């Protein structure tokens, strides 16, 4: 495990990078230097490896699902939930691809991670994988705005991201879902980093699997990779591991959040009007100190609107 923090960026430099990135409202492109982005990747990589693969976090915390390069929507989420370090954040992965500003999105999140390493936490999504983001937009954005070398630096950083988080020993968070190989949380802690994402097995499933409304047990996924799992699988896993809730991203849901398995699993998706193709809302999940969950809904932004957010009543203890 790498714990050395040599060569970390100075706080003043980080604050300047964050300030410049936050000026990119209204669709304005923010062009950091290649040297600055390399430093962000290298420093963040050190921090990821110094923290566990199964993060152990505490409420209160705000949880965000997929962002997919929709930088303006990320800024809207921070406007509502509070900019770090005023609130604790956990992001469930899929920062890049499909949206227009993957670079701004991942650079702001990495900069915040380095600046406030105990206030903001980033999990790995299935798009934080060279095989996937080579195809779905991030590679092309890096190549167009910088070069392929920089994309490879990001790949080295992504290979060190943690894959799951446990909030107050009761809420388990990951990007995708459960795995037929997963019996206890110790197995997640044992996954070695840095690592690529394999085509099958525990790590693959944690980032790729989906809940299945129609079938019980385990079923092959229509995605052509990993599997789906029924409500019975969720109940069995939570009961055996003394957990209350699974929180995951990975799927577009119309209202930004969607419950499954008698509210024992929730899907969070934080990219409204995803890719300009879906009329979905985005959501931000707030977990208070009593583990009471509430949702803030981010409606697709009309061109003239600045912050169309709606608060949903509290949902009771998870």
UniProtKB/Swiss-Prot annotation:
Q: What is its EC number?
A: 3.1.3.16
Q: How is the cofactor bound?
A: Binds 2 manganese ions per subunit.
Q: Which keywords accompany this UniProt record?
A: Cytoplasm, Hydrolase, Manganese, Metal-binding, Nucleus, Protein phosphatase
* Signal peptide, first to last residue: none
**Cofactor field:** Mn(2+)
What are the GO MF terms of this UniProt record? metal ion binding; protein serine/threonine phosphatase activity
Q: List, in alphabetical order, the GO biological process terms annotated in this UniProt record.
A: pollen tube growth; root hair cell tip growth
Catalyzed reactions per annotation:
O-phospho-L-seryl-[protein] + H2O = L-seryl-[protein] + phosphate; O-phospho-L-threonyl-[protein] + H2O = L-threonyl-[protein] + phosphate
Which family does the UniProt entry place this protein in? Belongs to the PPP phosphatase family. PP-1 subfamily.
Q: What does this protein do?
A: Serine/threonine-protein phosphatase that possesses phosphatase activity toward para-nitrophenyl phosphate (pNPP) in vitro.
Name of this chain's protein: Serine/threonine-protein phosphatase PP1 isozyme 9
Q: Which gene encodes it?
A: TOPP9
């Amino acid at each position: 495990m790498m714990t050395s923090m040599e060569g970390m960026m100075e706080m003043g430099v980080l604050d300047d990078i964050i300030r410049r990135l936050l000026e990119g409202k209204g669709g304005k492109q923010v062009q950091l230097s290649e040297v600055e982005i390399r430093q962000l990747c290298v420093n963040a990589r050190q921090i990821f490896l110094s923290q566990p693969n199964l993060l152990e976090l505490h409420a209160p915390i705000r949880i965000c699902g997929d962002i997919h390069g929709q930088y303006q929507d990320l800024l809207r989420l921070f406007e509502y939930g509070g900019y770090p370090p005023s609130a604790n954040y956990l992001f469930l992965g899929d920062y890049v691809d499909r949206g227009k500003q993957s670079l701004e999105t991942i650079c702001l999140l990495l900069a915040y991670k380095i600046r406030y390493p105990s206030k903001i936490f980033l999990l790995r999504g299935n798009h934080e994988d060279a095989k996937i983001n080579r195809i779905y937009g991030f590679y092309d954005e890096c190549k167009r705005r910088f070069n392929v070398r920089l994309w490879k630096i990001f790949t080295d950083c992504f290979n060190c991201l943690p894959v799951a988080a446990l909030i107050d020993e009761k809420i388990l968070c990951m990007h995708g879902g459960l795995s037929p190989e997963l019996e206890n949380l110790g197995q997640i802690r044992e996954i070695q980093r840095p690592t690529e994402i394999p085509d099958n097995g525990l790590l693959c499933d944690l980032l790729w699997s989906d809940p299945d409304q129609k079938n019980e047990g385990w079923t092959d996924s229509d995605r052509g990779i990993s599997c789906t799992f029924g409500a019975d699988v969720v109940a069995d896993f939570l009961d055996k591991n003394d957990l209350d809730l699974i929180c995951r991203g990975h799927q577009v849901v119309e209202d930004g959040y969607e419950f499954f398995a008698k509210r024992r699993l929730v899907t969070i998706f934080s990219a409204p009007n995803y890719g300009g193709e879906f009329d979905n809302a985005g959501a931000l999940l707030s977990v208070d100190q009593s583990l009471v969950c509430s949702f803030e809904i981010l409606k697709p932004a009309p061109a003239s609107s600045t912050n169309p957010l709606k608060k949903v009543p509290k949902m009771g203890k998870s």
